[in-house]
A protein has these predicted regions:
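Glycine-rich Rossmann-fold phosphate-binding loop(s) that bind the pyrophosphate
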Residues: 205-208, 298
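Adenosine-nucleotide cofactor-binding segment
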Residues: 200-206, 215-282
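Glycine-rich phosphate-binding loop and adjacent beta-alpha segment
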Residues: 277-325
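Residues located in well-ordered beta-strands
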Residues: 16-18, 28, 33, 45, ...
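Glycine-rich beta-strand-centered segment in the early N-terminal region that forms part
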Residues: 35-49, 62-109, 114, 167-169
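NAD(P)H dinucleotide-binding glycine-rich loop of Rossmann-like/cofactor-binding domains
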Residues: 106-204
Length: 325
């Protein structure tokens, strides 16, 4: 196990990180120096990280995150050092990193941190809430704390709120995606949609998030689990983890009618993972009366969903966003 970091030698600790200097650019591997670790922060030596579509999306966006920045938000590793106010983690603990939150707003107090009133500041801006950064690069400060972690590096400065201790470190390098993609898909089904054993659910888009949703629906023993995607390989994997029906979206002339044919009157709930507004509309239209459509896809700011309001009103349908499950 790693030796704890000497609090008086922060300037000696360096990390290798994939740094993005401008929107649409390529990552540059650079050596960063840790400037400080605050009393309420945790330093994690990363073992592995997943790559989420959100990371790729933010690479091309000139807004939200100033540069240079370290992205990544599906990290897993071991606690290397802790600040004096950290209560629940110790050096050597295996952890999976997830999103951050303020910890004290109305949503956080209600144990709904993914709807934190200050979510953007704690996750998208890639800096501490006070605007500072812990890492120094060759040409100046480098933004970190993307989703509270910036895991495209060998070390991560995070908070104990978003460093989840694991009971076992077996295959820890495989656990990173649990902190975002898998919890988003599975959590949307387990915590929000909650299909009953007599009900039907449709998952639009079965990449990692959608497959996690299918697995959760399987665990809840939903009667019908319909997966919709454009790739045969994904649909085949969806079958392997519990989908009872699959639809190849680009080969089905009327997806909504096909779903209603399978389910009888429409799905009880649906989940869109694609952020495609045409697909999201289908996810709403395929519902039976009083059905619920949840969406988790990261749509661009300003995206507009065009739906038949009369259909939603008369059908008593619900359409809601879901963040991090």
């Amino acid at each position: 196990m790693n030796t704890p970091l000497n609090p008086n030698a922060f300037h000696e600790l360096t990390a290798q990180a994939a740094v993005l200097h401008h929107a649409g650019g390529q990552f540059s591997m650079e050596t960063l120096t840790l400037k400080d670790l605050r009393d309420d922060e945790v330093l994690v030596k990363l073992l592995a990280t997943g790559v989420c579509h959100t990371d790729i999306s933010f690479m091309g966006r000139p807004f939200m995150v100033d540069k240079p920045v370290v992205l990544g938000h599906e990290g897993a590793g071991y606690v290397y050092a802790v600040g004096s106010q950290v209560k629940h983690l110790r050096v050597g603990d295996p952890v999976v990193l997830s999103f951050d939150a303020c910890g004290h707003c109305e949503s956080c107090e209600a144990h709904q941190p993914s709807y934190c009133h200050d979510f953007i500041n704690h996750n998208f801006l890639a800096q501490r809430p006070d605007g500072t950064t812990a890492w120094q690069g060759p040409s100046g400060p480098v933004r970190h704390a993307f989703f509270g972690q910036s895991s495209f590096a060998t070390y991560s400065v995070c908070h104990e709120r978003n460093a989840i201790k694991m009971d076992d470190d077996h295959d820890l390098e495989m656990f990173g995606p649990l902190g975002c993609g898998f919890q988003t898909g599975a959590g949307a089904v387990l915590n929000v949609l909650q299909p009953k054993t007599s009900q039907a659910i449709v998952v639009f888009g079965v990449g990692s998030v959608g497959l996690a949703a299918v697995m959760a629906a399987t665990a809840m023993k939903a009667r019908q689990i319909i997966a919709v995607d454009l790739k045969d390989s994904r649909l085949e994997m969806a079958k392997q983890v519990g989908a009872t029906h699959t639809i190849r979206g680009d080969q089905c002339p009327d997806i909504v009618s096909e779903i209603k044919s399978i389910t009888g009157a429409g799905a009880h709930c649906s989940l869109d993972t694609t952020a495609n507004m045409t697909v999201l509309r289908q996810a709403v239209e395929c519902l039976r009366p009083q059905g619920v459509c949840g969406f988790v896809g990261g749509a661009s700011a300003g995206s507009e969903l065009v739906v038949d309001v009369r259909d939603i009103m008369i059908g008593g349908k619900t359409v809601r966003g879901i963040v991090e499950g």
